[in-house]
C-alpha cells in the first residue's frame, strides 16, 4: 500500500479506503504507536473523530483507542498551558465557539455544539494544550 508522492497520499481513512477500493470494515491499518492492527470499531471511531492518517516510510498508520487516549493524556500533562472559560476562548481566537473545531482532550473527537454548550452552562473550562483549545466530550467527562 506504499504511495509514491506525499501530495497524493490520502489524509483520511475514508479517502484511503476509496483510493484502494476497501471498506472501513476490511481495512487493515496499524497503530502508529503500538503497531497493532486497529479493530473495525477502532477504524470507524477514528473515521468518526475525523482524525488524519499518518504516513511513515510510505505506509499509512492510525491510532488504536488505547494509544490515542494514553498519548492524549501524556500530551495534556506535558503541554498544558492554561484553562479558560468560553468567553476568553472566543476573545483570544476572535471566533465564536460554534465556528471553532475544539477537540476532546482525551479521545480527540470534535466537540458537538451541545458539548460546547455543556462547558458554557456548567462553568467548565476549556484547556489550551499544544497551541489549541480542547474540552471534554460527553463520554470523557470526569
UniProtKB/Swiss-Prot annotation:
Q: Which domain of life is it from?
A: Viruses
Q: Name one Pfam family in it.
A: E6
Which SUPFAM superfamilies did the record assign?
A: E6 C-terminal domain-like
Query: What GO terms describe the biological role, i.e. biological process, of this protein?
Result: DNA-templated transcription; regulation of DNA-templated transcription; symbiont-mediated perturbation of host apoptosis; symbiont-mediated perturbation of host ubiquitin-like protein modification; symbiont-mediated suppression of host innate immune response; symbiont-mediated suppression of host type I interferon-mediated signaling pathway
Task: Give the GO molecular function terms.
Answer: DNA binding; zinc ion binding
Q: Which keywords belong to this entry? A: Activator, DNA-binding, Early protein, Host cytoplasm, Host nucleus, Host-virus interaction, Inhibition of host innate immune response by virus, Metal-binding, Modulation of host cell apoptosis by virus, Transcription, Transcription regulation, Viral immunoevasion, Zinc, Zinc-finger
* Location (main, coarse): host cell
GO CC annotation, single: host cell cytoplasm
Chain positions of all zinc fingers (unnamed): 31-67, 104-140
Subcellular location(s): the record lists: Host cytoplasm; Host nucleus
Q: Give the multimer and partner information.
A: Forms homodimers. Interacts with ubiquitin-protein ligase UBE3A/E6-AP; this interaction stimulates UBE3A ubiquitin activity. Interacts with host TP53 and EP300; this interaction inhibits TP53 activity.
> Any miscellaneous information on file?
Belongs to the low risk human alphapapillomavirus family. The cancer-causing human papillomavirus E6 protein has a unique carboxy terminal PDZ domain containing substrate but low risk E6s do not possess this domain.
Q: What does this protein do?
A: Plays a major role in the induction and maintenance of cellular transformation. E6 associates with host UBE3A/E6-AP ubiquitin-protein ligase and modulates its activity. Sequesters tumor suppressor TP53 in the host cytoplasm and modulates its activity by interacting with host EP300 that results in the reduction of TP53 acetylation and activation. In turn, apoptosis induced by DNA damage is inhibited. E6 also protects host keratinocytes from apoptosis by mediating the degradation of host BAK1. May also inhibit host immune response.
Q: Which family does it belong to?
A: Belongs to the papillomaviridae E6 protein family.
HAMAP family, alphabetized: HPV_E6
Q: What is the protein named?
A: Protein E6
Species of provenance:
Human papillomavirus type 32
Amino acid at each position: 500500500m506504499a504511495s509514491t508522492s506525499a501530495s497524493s497520499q490520502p489524509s483520511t481513512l475514508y479517502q484511503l479506503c476509496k483510493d484502494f477500493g476497501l471498506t472501513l470494515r476490511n481495512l487493515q491499518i496499524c497503530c502508529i504507536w503500538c503497531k497493532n492492527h486497529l479493530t473495525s470499531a477502532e477504524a470507524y471511531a477514528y473515521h468518526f473523530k475525523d482524525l488524519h492518517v499518518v504516513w511513515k516510510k510510505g505506509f499509512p498508520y492510525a491510532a488504536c483507542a488505547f494509544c490515542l487516549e494514553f498519548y492524549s493524556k501524556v500530551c495534556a500533562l506535558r503541554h498544558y498551558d492554561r484553562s479558560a472559560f468560553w468567553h476568553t476562548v472566543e476573545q483570544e481566537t476572535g471566533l465564536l465557539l460554534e465556528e471553532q473545531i475544539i477537540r476532546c482532550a482525551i479521545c480527540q473527537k470534535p466537540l458537538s455544539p451541545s458539548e460546547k454548550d455543556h462547558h458554557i452552562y456548567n462553568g467548565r473550562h476549556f484547556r489550551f494544550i499544544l497551541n489549541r483549545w480542547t474540552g471534554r466530550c460527553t463520554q470523557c467527562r470526569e
